[in-house]
């Protein structure tokens, strides 16, 4: 997939995603697409936003299939409508990283990927990419 060049606005926030370390948001963007958004001043810091964007660009350059991604704007006005319990305030407004929500996707490990029967899939390229970006999420303990 590819990077979205335009900076999109977050038009609506549906929920906070509890599974993520950064507690990202599930949103509707100005283009009508649903996305997962990592916002500034999250509990992992702002470096996460840059890391996600750079990783997306690297994946795109070496033909790793990733969801469309880019930068979006989360406004003070949207933040102020969110539940107090989420712990977000205007410090979390600003430029964010987003990736389009792919509803049919599932997390996978290298063990599961090793049996993929698709000639267009390149496991070696994915392994190199994961090592390059220090991704440990696909490691299930049974791979090198």
What are these regions (language model features)?
Residues 105, 110-144:
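Conserved kinase catalytic-core segment
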């Amino acid at each position: 997939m590819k990077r979205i060049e335009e900076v999109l606005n977050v038009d609506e926030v549906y929920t906070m995603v509890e599974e993520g370390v950064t507690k990202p948001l599930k949103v509707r963007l100005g283009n009508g697409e649903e996305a997962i958004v990592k916002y500034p001043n999250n509990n992992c810091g702002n470096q996460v936003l840059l890391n996600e964007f750079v990783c997306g660009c690297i994946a795109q350059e070496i033909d790793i299939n990733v969801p469309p991604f880019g930068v979006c704007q989360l406004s003070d006005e949207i933040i102020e409508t969110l539940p107090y319990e989420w712990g977000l305030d205007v410090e979390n407004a600003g430029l964010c990283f987003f990736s389009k929500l792919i509803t049919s996707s599932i997390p996978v490990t290298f063990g599961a990927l090793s049996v993929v029967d698709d000639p267009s899939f390149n496991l070696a390229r994915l392994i190199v990419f994961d090592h390059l970006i220090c991704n440990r999420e696909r490691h299930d303990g049974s791979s090198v």
